[in-house]
Regions:
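Residue-level signature of the C-terminal ends
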Residues: 57, 108-111, 131, 169-172, ...
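Terminal, non-catalytic domain-edge segments
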Residues: 25-50, 168-193, 219-226, 230, ...
């Protein structure tokens, strides 16, 4: 092979590799990554494309469905199918739905001033305001209020995600300056009602305030069950987001201060030490691994996702709804497919709470 021919082949190979890398860089963002972009990016054509996607995915009720990558490139056939689904009754705040779409649309409109994005935004904001119960809580789904969908939902930070959005609107954060005063005032009122609901749903055990259940009854405000493995309990996971939200209040009332301190006391009391929750590769398991608890005296603190309200013991539940006190006793599919232990309260105790105390006094 001649040197010239070899050089030519190398040059062609270089072009192919360069094109491949460049093309990889141009791949459309996923929806989670689109939410993480800098403000400057929202002036881009890609941001415009994704914002227009959101208009197609938006339901007639005003909200959005969950578990969908709304940043994908849609074909004409995709668009036709989605437009035909607009009447579906699956608008939800579960799994970071609706409030994240509204956050994206606000940033897109602020950057590009496309009126259609503002119109969709206001429709979604009105949906959230309408979905709020008179007692201040939000259901997981609206207007579909079947089964546990109707419960006030803290699970996976659903209600807290909505309240953060409304708080930022009320506070006139830069990306929400286009919101009219009437809606801004409604957002502020909704946040205050939400805070009242949080305070009223904090579970009291033996005369002491503790934390919250992942769901609460929309009428009685009592802790409520959801799926078969999500029973009435004290939540070591969702309660972290609730406390952080309460800590973000600039001028907390005495009731808010008392709520925070009581929850922190519960987290201190309920932490689990000397253990790790690890995934061990195991091809015989459904997920390809098995999660097990191992002893480790150097491990940082953990909290169970759920605690028995009366005894404060960690509980673990499979799809048969039978309570176990050892995670190893529930079936493979649930044991390895759910976050039974969490460590999110560690930073709350070691960093967030001390800073809050410094700001608001002992």
């Amino acid at each position: 092979m001649s040197c010239t021919h070899s050089s030519h082949n190398l040059f062609v190979l270089f072009l192919l590799v360069f094109h491949s890398v460049s093309s990889g860089q141009q791949k459309p963002l996923t929806w989670p990554n689109a939410l993480k972009q800098d403000p400057e990016w929202f002036s881009s054509r890609e941001a415009l494309r994704i914002a227009d996607n959101l208009l197609i995915y938006q339901r007639d009720a005003g909200g959005w469905p969950k578990n969908t990558d709304m940043a994908v490139v849609l074909t004409d056939a995709d668009k036709s199918k989605l437009l035909a689904e607009k009447k579906q009754n699956d608008s939800t705040i579960d799994n970071s739905s609706t409030y994240t779409q509204l956050s994206f649309l606000a940033r897109a409109f602020t950057a590009q001033q496309q009126r259609r994005h503002a119109d969709a935004y206001f429709k979604g904001l009105d949906y959230l305001l309408k979905a709020q119960y008179a007692n201040g809580g939000w259901p997981q789904f609206y207007p579909d209020l079947e089964g546990y969908y109707k419960h006030i939902t803290y699970n996976d930070d659903a209600m807290i995600g909505v309240m953060k959005l409304l708080r930022d609107i009320a506070a006139k954060k830069p990306e929400y300056l286009f919101v009219d005063d009437a809606r801004r005032k409604k957002a502020a009122v909704a946040v205050e009602k939400g805070i009242e609901c949080i305070l009223k749903t904090q579970i009291v055990v033996d005369g002491k305030k503790t934390v919250w259940c992942a769901q609460h009854d929309e009428v009685t405000l009592a802790p409520a069950a959801a799926r078969k493995f999500e029973l009435v309990s004290l939540s070591g996971g969702e309660s972290v987001g609730i406390v952080r939200f309460l800590m973000s209040i600039d001028k907390p009332s005495p009731d808010v201060v008392a709520s925070i301190k009581a929850a922190i006391a519960w987290f201190e009391k309920s932490k689990l030490t000397g253990i790790k929750w690890v995934a061990v590769p195991d091809p015989t398991k459904i997920h390809g691994f098995d999660r097990v608890v191992v002893k480790d005296p150097t491990a940082g603190p953990l909290w169970a996702r759920f605690y028995d309200i009366k005894t404060n013991r960690p509980i673990f539940v499979g799809r048969d709804s039978v309570v176990h006190y050892d995670v190893a006793e529930i079936e493979d599919e649930r044991r390895n497919g759910y976050a039974w232990y969490v460590d999110s309260a560690a930073d709350l105790l070691s960093n967030d709470y001390p800073r809050w105390l410094t700001k608001h006094g002992n």
